[in-house]
C-alpha cells in the first residue's frame, strides 16, 4: 500500500513539475513581449486550480498515510497555494491579472515563485522516487 502512495505522489509530482515549467515559459514569454498580458494571464489562470488540487491532494495523502516528515514539508507550499487563491481581489481576473502583472514587480515575483516551486517539486520528485523504491524493496 505504501508503494502505491508513493507511485501516485511521484506521478502527481511529475505533473506539477511540468506545470511549473509551463508557468516559467509562459511568464518569460510575457517578459520578452512574445505574448500579451491578457493571453498570458488567461493561460496561467486556467492551471491555478489544478495546481492547487494536485498539491493539496498529495499533502492530504501524506497525512492520511502517516508520512509526517513529507506532510510537514508539503504543508507550507499547499497553504501558500490556498492563501494565494483565496486572497485574489474581487475585481481581478484571477491570481494572474493582466492589468496588474506589470505593476510593482509582480512579473518578477511570479517568476521567482515559479522557479522556487520548480526546485521544490524537483526535490520532492527525488524524495518520492527514493521512498517508492524503498517501499518496493521492503514489501
Curated annotation (Swiss-Prot):
GO terms for cellular component: COPII-coated ER to Golgi transport vesicle; endoplasmic reticulum; endoplasmic reticulum membrane; endoplasmic reticulum-Golgi intermediate compartment. The keyword Lipoprotein does not apply. GO terms for molecular function: CCR5 chemokine receptor binding; signaling receptor binding. It holds the Pfam family Cornichon. Involved in G protein-coupled receptors (GPCRs) trafficking from the endoplasmic reticulum to the cell surface; it promotes the exit of GPCRs from the early secretory pathway, likely through interaction with the COPII machinery. Its main location: membrane. InterPro entries: Cornichon (IPR003377). It comes from Bos taurus (Bovine). This is Protein cornichon homolog 4. Keywords: Endoplasmic reticulum, ER-Golgi transport, Membrane, Protein transport, Transmembrane, Transmembrane helix, Transport. The keyword Transmembrane helix applies.
Amino acid at each position: 500500500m505504501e508503494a502505491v502512495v508513493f507511485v501516485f505522489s511521484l506521478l502527481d509530482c511529475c505533473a506539477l513539475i511540468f506545470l511549473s515549467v509551463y508557468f516559467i515559459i509562459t511568464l518569460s514569454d510575457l517578459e520578452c513581449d512574445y505574448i500579451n498580458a491578457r493571453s498570458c494571464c488567461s493561460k496561467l489562470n486556467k492551471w491555478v486550480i489544478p495546481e492547487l488540487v494536485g498539491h493539496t491532494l498529495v499533502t492530504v495523502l501524506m497525512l492520511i498515510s502517516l508520512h509526517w516528515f513529507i506532510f510537514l514539508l508539503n504543508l507550507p507550499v499547499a497553504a501558500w497555494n490556498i492563501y494565494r487563491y483565496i486572497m485574489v481581489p474581487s475585481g481581478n481576473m484571477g491570481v494572474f491579472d493582466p492589468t496588474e502583472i506589470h505593476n510593482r514587480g509582480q512579473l518578477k515575483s511570479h517568476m521567482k515563485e515559479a522557479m522556487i516551486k520548480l526546485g521544490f517539486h524537483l526535490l520532492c520528485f527525488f524524495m518520492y522516487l527514493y521512498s517508492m523504491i524503498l517501499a518496493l524493496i521492503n514489501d
